Amino acid sequence: MEGYRLLYPMRTYLIVSGHGEETNVMAADWVTVVSFDPFIVGVAVAPKRTTHKLIKKYGEFVISVPSLDVLRDVWIAGTKKGPSKLKEMSVTLIPSKKVKVPSIEEALANIECRVIDARSYGDHTFFVGEVVGYTYKDYAFEKGKPNLKAKFLAHVSWSEFVTFSEKVHKAE
């Protein structure tokens, strides 16, 4: 077993990069909050990925939060290469509010980022993005917290995904 799998299951995201004819969508698990004030996030991307090239070229990306409803699109984004895969996907690209990179209409949330740092660590580059805007579906984030009924996706291994249960166990 590969050691990094000990950290799974992990939330799954769609990373949108580029714009116009160069728009690309990649599935990614390695996404994290770096700071909440200011709101800064990071994503690890392998240099061989089209997404890597486009983030470096344009200095922007969007983190889209998918639900179980777009699992087929997540699978395509994670297993196919290059912008041509968008023709196989059913998601709708819409203009973002603050960046040129489009957002995904069907996403539970779209987080718009401008790159403020990028460093290579092993076989990936960690892109750090300042969040300059975001949108979300009201039903997915009720009362300021995630509504688990929205079916947020988590990746278990290769083609296996789970959603979070509706039961919330409270620590006492």
Curated annotation (Swiss-Prot):
SUPFAM superfamilies, sorted: FMN-binding split barrel
Family annotation (Pfam families): Flavin_Reduct (PF01613)
Q: What does this protein need as cofactor?
A: FMN
Keywords linked to the UniProt accession: Flavoprotein, FMN
Q: Which GO terms describe its molecular function?
A: FMN binding
Note the InterPro entries from the entry.
Flavin_Rdtase-like_dom (IPR002563), Flavoredoxin (IPR052174), Split_barrel_FMN-bd (IPR012349)
By sequence similarity, the record places it as follows:
Belongs to the flavoredoxin family.
Q: What is this protein called?
A: Uncharacterized protein PH0856
